[in-house]
Amino acid sequence: MGITELAVLRWLHIIAMVYWLGGEWGVFNTSTHVINRNLSMEERRRHMQTAYHIDILARIGIISLLPLGMHMGYLWGVQPYGGDFLVAVWVLAIGWLALCISAYFYRETDRGIQLTLWDERVRFVLIPVMVIASISSLLGYGPFNVGPMQYWFSIKILLYSVTLMIGLKLRFIMREWTTLFRVLAEGPNQEAENQLEKSLALGKRLAYFYWITIASVAFFGATKAV
């Protein structure tokens, strides 16, 4: 068969999925030490930095899946928009990646928080667009093709948008870490400690649903069952 455009895209898609799922698992485990009051603040901050280092790979993975998926969808014939549309998708995705990576490098600064807010605004626009497009397609109104063995693409887009919603809430939680650790750096603060534990407990509950949804995205992409 040789090396084809579709084969390369599938390879990149697999890598993105691996870093997405693996990265989220790494953050999940590392975050436990962030709220451990028995550790020194320096040690807890070190674990928080480790979580950020792992999380950026997951963020790169989840963003990369969008242009890769749309590109492969065109080659598979389940989404009809190629040419300039795909170019625009790739350009916008690269811009989104640049924004996300910049927020990572400027983390724990006011500039980093502002960049993170812009990253969140992108999701606020993208999520409803994807939800509407996927549901509309499943109902037969487009923009994606539906028919025998074609529904999987719209289902996958819908599930992907759900992961973005969950991921957005997890972003809120990680952004809150930065604010709370600024407070804790000034000295012991029971209220900040309690809020840190509360937000992390919520994040861990969300993580279980997150992994199930990610696995479902992978299932429909791999099996194309409907």
What kind of feature is each model-predicted range?
Residues G2-V226:
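Polytopic transmembrane helical bundles with strong interfacial aromatic enrichment
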